[in-house]
Amino acid sequence: MMLRGNLKQVRIEKNPARLRALESAAGESEPVAAAAMALTLAGEQPPPPAPSEEHPDEEMGFTIDIKSFLKPGEKTYTQRCRLFVGNLPTDITEEDFKRLFERYGEPSEVFINRDRGFGFIRLESRTLAEIAKAELDGTILKSRPLRIRFATHGAALTVKNLSPVVSNELLEQAFSQFGPVEKAVVVVDDRGRATGKGFVEFAAKPPARKALERCGDGAFLLTTTPRPVIVEPMEQFDDEDGLPEKLMQKTQQYHKEREQPPRFAQPGTFEFEYASRWKALDEMEKQQREQVDRNIREAKEKLEAEMEAARHEHQLMLMRQDLMRRQEELRRLEELRNQELQKRKQIQLRHEEEHRRREEEMIRHREQEELRRQQEGFKPNYMENREQEMRMGDMGPRGAINMGDAFSPAPAGTQGPPPMMGMNMNNRGTIPGPPMGPGPAMGPEGAANMGTPMIPDNGAVHNDRFPQGPPSQMGSPMGNRTGSETPQAPMSAVGPVSGGPGGFGRGSQGGNFEGPNKRRRY
């Protein structure tokens, strides 16, 4: 078998502690575990070694740990673990088919087409599938040799035009938006440099078709550079098993071509001439391919240069657009600010106008109130002035009063003080004097005439205190009123003070009231 050359026997002991240690050691060495699994599943036993003197009771054998066949990060039950089984008997059942692979773990997918004699089965890991393929390929089942190979991956896509900075993880992350991805690999050369190609394997066909359609219709970019990936269905090649002799069909063409063994053509022969022409054609194809590759490479470089220049131009255009947008925004903000200032000015002007109007209204209202108060306060003021004039002797409430006296013939305002009541200090007789001017007339209610002498010249007292005569008009120097007074008899001065004005040289300012309506001044 294929894997038997790499087989290495594993010793298993009965001691559980040493058994676990050996199992962990077997888990660290994947080739050893795979070989042990292959031997165990094949039912072959290696030749037992000589028993050790230190451990004579040890028994030799093999142990298999399924987890040791999984690589770090490897997914289970993927499309890469799917096997195609051909040349099956037509009467095989699903239970018989499962029983055939039961030694390689629990399968997850079993499909049988009895009419055409083939089926599919999916195992847990790729390593188990390889072991099962190596062990069961060519096995005779009901007189039919089984043909087992890996099934074609119907959900695999080839990705071209990849950037040198794209990794397996980025490729898987990019295509995970279409559906679950089982594997994504970027192909590299012998130096580990990216070739710009890769493949993506999906868990099912619908996500693969979706990715193929979306990437074909649009431009799917993986990096900043606007370099779209080219997605195509993956071409399936069996580069592991190839075409063995046992699978060759023995046709007439097969036997004709196999008549001559492998050899070199001799120069100058018919074989050599046409072999040379075939080589020239291949060389021309190679040259043309190289020229095409060179042209494509130059075109790619030119496109990259143009793309770089266009990118800078595009960035400048974006910057200009952004600058214009900002300028437009600033202009709009300036307009808004001006409008706001204009509104504020208008509001301020309205407020000022309202304030001015209110002040004018308040002033007008205050003036009206002041005028109303003045109009309301005119009568009390007038009465107070009138009362003051009355108290000063200009006018009484019951008639005009003449401030003149019988003993003071001169009217008010004339030179020289009037004599007091026409008497001197030593004699009660009358003192002759100049005739008195016009005195006050009687009021409508019988105001006394202050111009009548109280004692006549002969010492007799007049019984008639108020002389009979027509009423005179009120007159007063302060009130600007004129009146007439009956002339009185002159009084002669008697006493030490003689030859001058009678009395003490002063007239009675308040007059002499002896009537019933007499009003004292003091």
UniProtKB/Swiss-Prot annotation:
Region (Sufficient for paraspeckles localization): 124-357
Main location: nucleus
InterPro entries reported for this sequence: NOPS, Nucleotide-bd_a/b_plait_sf, PSP1_RRM1, RBD_domain_sf, RRM_dom
Chain intervals with Gly residues compositional bias: 497-513
Pfam family, one: RRM_1
Keywords: Acetylation, Activator, Biological rhythms, Coiled coil, Cytoplasm, Immunity, Innate immunity, Methylation, Nucleus, Phosphoprotein, Repeat, Repressor, RNA-binding, Transcription, Transcription regulation
Annotated positions of the Omega-N-methylarginine modification: 506
Residue ranges of the region described as Sufficient for perinucleolar caps localization and interaction with NONO: 230-357
PANTHER family associated with the record: RNA RECOGNITION MOTIF-CONTAINING
Function: RNA-binding protein required for the formation of nuclear paraspeckles. Binds to poly(A), poly(G) and poly(U) RNA homopolymers. Regulates, cooperatively with NONO and SFPQ, androgen receptor-mediated gene transcription activity in Sertoli cell line. Regulates the circadian clock by repressing the transcriptional activator activity of the CLOCK-BMAL1 heterodimer.
Full protein name: Paraspeckle component 1
